[in-house]
């Protein structure tokens, strides 16, 4: 399936608020908005608390469409004609991973160099497409970008270009970390690498965006890298903080009946022996 990221949005453009006047007795502001070729003096009312004169934002004009099939029509608000709607990031289907600042309370505040009348898809990165490919359970080898590329190369009889790698192997991890596998029927092999001198922090925007488009939420640079590589080559990975591992040990085993685990998104799950867990010296 080919998904048009901005396909549900129509007639939403960059608008510059040239005038912003409070409407007496209401929480609204009556704005004059420059939308380039669509009109330089369009009157739109908004209740957003962060609106200001000079703001560049997303203007949904009369007859426009927003995600979810929402139709915008010119109509009076508190007795004053409003010829559209000024939009928040959420109303455009955005979050901070897709476009920084999208989750701010109020209107989407765009850079001052954005040109009035420009389709909003071009400004916030929604002028793009996603290939959504359904993979059957017996083709786990295709559940990655590399896997799909390998399949396409085979079908078209073309050479496969492998991802570039550049790394140096130092001492073996055995000297720092003990790894053992009890449930070999579920996990025939488990490999660990020890990486030093890492500073946890926020991932770059391009990586957060790529993960979001694949349905994953950005957590930190370390976690995001493991997820990004998993999507690229199909190898599931997890990063552990060595300082938090009890006894510097990793054990792969079946879960105990009723054992509980809390995931990175703070959700708790109750496990059964049919579940596989990765533990440190004492717990999953």
Predicted regions and their residues:
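Residues forming anionic-ligand binding surfaces in small-molecule and nucleic-acid pockets
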Residues: 116-135, 174-213
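Conserved phosphate/anionic-ligand binding catalytic regions in large, soluble enzymes, centered on
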Residues: 48-57, 137-154, 215-241, 281-284
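Hydrophobic alpha-helical scaffolding
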Residues: 44, 76, 93, 135-142, ...
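Conserved catalytic alpha/beta cores of large enzymes that bind or transform nucleotide phosphates
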Residues: 90-91, 109-111, 200, 273-284
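Phosphate-backbone binding interfaces of nucleic-acid-interacting proteins
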Residues: 1-169, 173
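Conserved glycine-bearing catalytic or ligand-binding loops at nucleotide- and phosphate-handling centers
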Residues: 62-64, 68-84, 88, 149, ...
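Conserved mixed alpha/beta core segments that line enzyme active sites in large multi-domain catalysts
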Residues: 16-44, 209, 226-284
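Aspartic protease
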Residues: 70, 74-92, 172-179, 186, ...
